[in-house]
Amino acid sequence: MGTGIGASEPDGSIPVRVAAYNVEFGRSTSPEQVGEMFKPYKLDIIGFNEVPDGDWTALVGKVLGMKHSYVGKISSANHKDKYKSILSRTPFEATVEHGLSVERRRSWNPASVVKAVTKVDGVAVAFYSLHICRSKDSHDTGHAYRLANEVLPKEKTNRVIVLGDFNNNLGDVAMNKLESSGFRATWEDLKIDTSKEFTYNALKPEQPNLGVIDHIFYNTGSRASTKEGGIIELKNPLSDHKPVWAEIVFPKRP
């Protein structure tokens, strides 16, 4: 499952090991259980959504030896304990939360994305963790549209990772919008056919599922590629979503 944590490749490229997990406000798990589950993956950064407020994220980090956490202030749809957070092995240089709410039928609000900039092996990476509403039928409204058109174009960091619960499948208009704005899903590099997999509902696998709605993207301008990754299949699910992970390798110079 890869070599170490934050260690350069022989060619000088920088591997960044990341994961995304919707923990359903911790209903079916504890932060300690989540930390133990993630241990084998030797992650650099984790993006959580539907995460409880307070020290929940930091407690996961305590298990993993990841000391730096940031929790946003906007809870999805104003529900209790549905925040977005970032857990990192390396210190943050900057953190911010961007609101993504829209006036649109069939859309819950508020929605947001949290961002942190950190250096992995001396190289700055901007990391976005989100939870947004499905917006399959529209190209110019919706949370994904605001993300792709208003937030990400302002990013100055050369290496960018965007992940979380998108509530959209690859091929949906919302996902196409993100990809056309210069982002690539790790599934494509890994040659994983997401139409044959699902990340929701992990607790009711026998029911009709929503397919893969949790994704990891990186900016194509960085010339990165995905070395490893996939959906983490748990015998005893810790949430209604499955966690997803990837090792993204960035060239030293984009």
Feature-to-residue mapping (PLM):
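Active-site neighborhood of phospho(di)ester-bond hydrolases with catalytic His/Asp-centered motifs
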Residues: 46-49, 71-73, 161-165, 185-189
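His/acidic metal-ligating clusters that form di-metal
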Residues: 115-128, 139-166, 174-176
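N-terminal, active-site-proximal structural segment of metallo-dependent hydrolase catalytic domains
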Residues: 1-63, 76-81, 251-254
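Structured beta-strand-rich core segments of catalytic domains in phosphoester-bond hydrolases
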Residues: 49-126, 132, 223, 228
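Metal-dependent phosphoester-hydrolase catalytic domains
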Residues: 2-6, 152-160, 168-254
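Active-site-proximal beta-strand elements of phosphoester/diester hydrolases
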Residues: 15-25, 123-134
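Active-site environment of divalent metal-dependent phosphoester hydrolases
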Residues: 25-29, 53-56, 135-137, 167-173, ...
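Active-site metal-binding loops of divalent metal-dependent hydrolases
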Residues: 21-23, 50-51, 130-132, 165-166, ...
